[in-house]
């Protein structure tokens, strides 16, 4: 997926679902938020990437939307201090790769919400591969 596509999809997800987590964010504002984008290459000998990704996501957060045909899932993981700051994730399974984009908004006190959400996903993904 192109970076512009990721930004646009993530902005749509944030503007639609942020109010459920105590945030009011318009798409225009969401497009201007700082975003951490990470691409992971994952080798799977025990199953397909999408199924493992979905299993991991169901363990560590709340799945918001899912497009099975395109291998795309959007999710929110409560992270940061006391797990009260939402991190919005957009993931795409493509063969053995998972393309991961995370958006979070830290205030004056940095809670490293995006990093913690990524760590939570990676841990859940490792558990899914092991089961």
Model-derived segments and spans:
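Ser/Thr-rich, low-complexity intrinsically disordered terminal regions
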Residues: 1-131
């Amino acid at each position: 997926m192109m970076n512009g596509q990721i930004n646009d999809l993530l902005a749509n997800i944030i503007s639609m679902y942020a109010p459920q987590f105590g945030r009011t964010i318009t798409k225009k504002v969401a497009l201007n938020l700082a975003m951490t984008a990470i691409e992971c290459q994952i080798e799977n000998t025990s199953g397909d990437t999408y199924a493992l990704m979905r299993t991991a996501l169901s363990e560590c957060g709340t799945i918001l939307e899912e497009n099975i045909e395109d291998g795309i899932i959007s999710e929110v993981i409560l992270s940061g201090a006391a797990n009260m700051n939402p991190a919005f994730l957009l993931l795409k399974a493509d063969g053995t790769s998972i393309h991961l984009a995370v958006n979070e908004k830290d205030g004056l006190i940095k809670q490293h919400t995006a990093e913690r959400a990524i760590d939570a996903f990676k841990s859940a993904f490792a558990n899914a591969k092991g089961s």
